[in-house]
Regions:
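Active-site segment of metal-dependent pyrophosphate-handling enzymes
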Residues: 15-19, 58-62, 66-107, 135-144, ...
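Conserved Nudix-box catalytic region and its N-terminal flanking loop in Nudix hydrolases
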Residues: 29-71, 138-153, 159
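Short proline/glycine-enriched turn/loop segments at secondary-structure junctions
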Residues: 9-10, 87-88, 189-194
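Long, intrinsically disordered, low-complexity Ser/Thr/Pro-rich regulatory/activation regions
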Residues: 186-221
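NUDIX/MutT-family hydrolases
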Residues: 97-100, 106-139, 147-155, 160, ...
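Short helix-coil junctions and helix-kink-helix linkers
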Residues: 159-168
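N-terminal strand-loop-strand
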Residues: 2, 6-44
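Short, well-ordered beta-strand micro-motif
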Residues: 23-25, 99-101, 201-203
Length: 221
């Protein structure tokens, strides 16, 4: 969802609060952020909306996601509030930011996360904070699986972790940590990948335990 563009010379409206959504996906070892062109102006904008009186902010974020993508992110969390005097498409002086993670979809508005300099200053800070939140929550929540389709290979899962963490992981240690977390199960199907042997497909299927870690333990990597 995008709103009308703000005039560069018009100050933020006091008391106006926007909800901004940083949608993040994964493709070809890169994180991508959803950003739309600003109407009647140069630049980009994150999807945003203005809550009506009595609206729950979580619900507003869900509505924004549905309007932008037609679906709700598999994982979504409030990142924080951002306030400054910089221009915002809603002309708001305060923005509540949510981060959402979803699998890749064919949309012209996905952009590599380091190529969103055309966003306004406040929204650029939201992207930076959202990516940091995703990294810090990677161990505590099944975020990495939210980037992937229902069925995936272990190599795809490892590449997703490597992309989010921005570092290479040892294959054997990663798979031991994944096995110790009881998070995946084989589907019984295989996928051909290049000239090598077909790769086994897995799905996210966490085993119920009294003390559950919902992500792969990063200290084991």
């Amino acid at each position: 969802m995008s709103g009308r563009s703000a005039s560069p010379s018009r100050p933020a409206r006091t008391g106006v609060v926007s909800v901004d959504l940083v949608l993040v996906t994964y493709r070809d070892r890169e994180l991508h952020v959803y950003a739309e062109p600003v109407k009647k102006a140069r630049g980009l904008t994150l999807p945003w909306g203005i809550p009506a009186k009595g609206d729950a902010l979580d619900g507003v974020a869900v509505r924004i996601a549905r309007r932008a993508m037609g679906s709700v992110p598999k994982w979504m969390e409030q990142v924080g509030a951002f306030a400054d005097r910089s221009m915002h498409p809603a002309e708001s002086n305060l923005s509540v930011c949510y981060a959402g993670v979803m699998p890749w979809t064919d949309s012209e508005f996905w952009r590599e996360h380091h190529a969103v300099s055309a966003l306004g200053e406040r929204q650029r800070r939201m992207v930076t904070a959202s990516l940091a939140t995703i990294r810090t929550q990677l161990e505590q929540a099944p975020i990495a699986f939210s980037f992937l389709d229902r069925d995936f290979t272990l190599s795809e899962l490892q590449q997703t972790y490597e992309t989010v963490l921005a570092r290479r992981l040892h294959k054997a240690r990663f798979r031991r940590a994944l096995q110790a977390a009881f998070l995946v199960e084989p589907t019984g199907n295989w996928r051909s990948e290049g000239r090598g042997r077909p790769a086994q497909l897995y799905r996210y299927a966490p085993r119920k335990r009294k003390r559950v870690r919902r992500g792969v333990r990063l200290d084991l990597l």
